[in-house]
Amino acid sequence: RCAHGTYYSNDSQQCLLNCCWWGGGDHCCR
Protein backbone atom coordinates (compact mmCIF):
# COMPACT_ATOMS: atom_id res chain seq x y z
CA ARG A 1 0.00 0.00 0.00
CA CYS A 2 1.12 3.52 -0.65
CA ALA A 3 1.43 6.04 2.15
CA HIS A 4 -1.27 8.64 2.74
CA GLY A 5 -0.97 11.40 0.17
CA THR A 6 0.56 9.11 -2.45
CA TYR A 7 -0.68 6.73 -5.12
CA TYR A 8 0.90 3.76 -6.90
CA SER A 9 2.00 4.54 -10.43
CA ASN A 10 2.02 1.51 -12.73
CA ASP A 11 4.14 3.45 -15.20
CA SER A 12 6.99 4.13 -12.80
CA GLN A 13 6.34 1.08 -10.57
CA GLN A 14 6.45 3.14 -7.37
CA CYS A 15 4.40 5.36 -5.10
CA LEU A 16 4.23 8.99 -6.19
CA LEU A 17 2.90 12.06 -4.41
CA ASN A 18 -0.76 12.53 -5.14
CA CYS A 19 -1.35 15.98 -6.54
CA CYS A 20 -4.50 16.33 -4.41
CA TRP A 21 -2.11 16.44 -1.49
CA TRP A 22 -0.93 19.75 -2.97
CA GLY A 23 -4.49 20.93 -3.74
CA GLY A 24 -4.38 19.70 -7.33
CA GLY A 25 -8.01 18.59 -7.50
CA ASP A 26 -10.06 15.41 -7.73
CA HIS A 27 -8.90 14.49 -11.24
CA CYS A 28 -5.54 13.62 -9.69
CA CYS A 29 -6.90 11.47 -6.88
CA ARG A 30 -6.88 7.67 -7.02
From Swiss-Prot:
The keyword Secreted applies. One of its GO terms (cellular component) is extracellular region. Transmembrane segments: none annotated. Its main location: secreted. GO terms for molecular function: toxin activity. Keywords: Disulfide bond, Neurotoxin, Secreted, Toxin. Expressed by the venom duct. The keyword Protein biosynthesis does not apply. It comes from the Eukaryota. Contains 3 disulfide bonds. It is found in: Secreted. The cysteine framework is XVIII (C-C-CC-CC). This is Conotoxin Bt12.1. It comes from Conus betulinus.
